[in-house]
Amino acid sequence: MIRSAVVLTVLVGVCLAQRGFVGGWSQVDPKIRPDLLELAHFAVASQTAGLEYYHTVLELTKASQQVVAGVNYKLTLKVAPSKCKVSETVYSKELCQPQLNAAPKDCEAQLYVVPWRNTKEVTSFECN
């Protein structure tokens, strides 16, 4: 009986560790979640301070999420300057292609999304 309880406790612990704890951060595979790439482009488009050209997303390398009253996302991405001038156009992932020989940067974006209110907000964006 005690042995069964111990085995059950260990199995529950393993399952919780794999799924992440409620309110905790859990890894998400960005390759199977195209909505995360859309969020990455949204985050990049909002970062215009001091830029002549928008940056554009080259690759979304890592993602995690935290379920709260909505969802927090941490996205790790590679960006590079695009061909689109901030002063002349609105950002478009289709039109704002990377400049030739542009040096990529590693960035982390954090976003807060409330799907039932149709709202999303960039809460943090930093590049190395």
From Swiss-Prot:
Q: What sections of the protein cross the membrane?
A: none
Could you tell me in which tissues this protein is expressed? Mainly expressed in gut.
User: Could you tell me where this protein is found in the cell?
Assistant: Secreted
Respond yes or no to whether keyword Secreted is given for this record. yes
Q: Which InterPro entries match?
A: Cystatin_dom, Cystatin_sf, Prot_inh_cystat_CS
Keywords (alphabetical) are:
Disulfide bond, Protease inhibitor, Secreted, Signal, Thiol protease inhibitor
- According to the entry, every stretch annotated as the Cystatin domain falls at 20-128
Q: Which Pfam families match?
A: Cystatin (PF00031)
Example GO CC term: the record gives: cytoplasm
Q: Name the PROSITE patterns for this protein.
A: CYSTATIN (PS00287)
| SMART domains with a match to the protein in the record | CY
Key word Amino-acid biosynthesis present in the record?
no
**What is the similarity comment for this entry?**
Belongs to the cystatin family.
Q: What does this protein do?
A: Inhibitor of cysteine proteinases. Strongly inhibits mammalian cathepsin B and H, and moderately inhibits mammalian cathepsin C. Also inhibits endogenous cathepsin B-like but not cathepsin C-like proteinases. May have a protective role against undesired digestion of a stored blood meal by endogenous peptidases.
**What is this protein's record name?**
Cystatin-1
Q: Record the organism.
A: Ornithodoros moubata
